[in-house]
Design a protein with these regions (language model features):
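Acidic, surface-exposed loops and disordered segments
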Residues: 1-127
Length: 127
């Protein structure tokens, strides 16, 4: 909620300039010292993505507006956010959830296209 910090986070992500005007933001990070070793190492991304989505759902349930902005895998962006937050090298910011009060009700875009749904195998191909 520190305004200088929110402004610095906004500067680190050109697509999220609105962060500077928000009441708060939550930075979701992966701790590489706790990540699975070996072939499952990258599961930290899924763990953090699930946490990010849960934050969005909780904010919505509380009547708040929330936006998921990305950091990782954009090295420059995640590195800059790490500097702003003084994170150790073992902590990688995956996302920033910017939270505030909605200005009004927005209508969801209808992007449903039944032609893009596959059943059993991709594209309705025969097995």
């Amino acid at each position: 909620t520190e305004k200088k910090l929110l402004a610095a986070l906004a500067e680190a992500n050109a697509q999220a300039g609105f962060t500077k005007d928000a009441p708060l933001a939550i930075v979701v990070c992966g701790d590489m010292t706790k990540a699975i070793e070996g072939s499952g190492h990258e599961f930290w991304v899924q763990d953090c993505a699930a946490a990010t989505e849960n934050i969005l759902l909780a904010a919505h349930a509380m009547g708040l507006g929330a936006v998921w902005t990305g950091a990782y895998p954009l090295e420059e962006r995640s590195s800059e956010m790490g500097k702003v937050l003084k994170l150790p090298e073992t902590m990688v910011p995956l996302s920033v959830v910017v939270i505030g009060y909605p200005k009004g009700e927005t209508k969801a875009k209808d992007k449903w296209d039944a032609q893009k749904v596959s059943y059993n195998v991709y594209g309705g191909q025969d097995m």
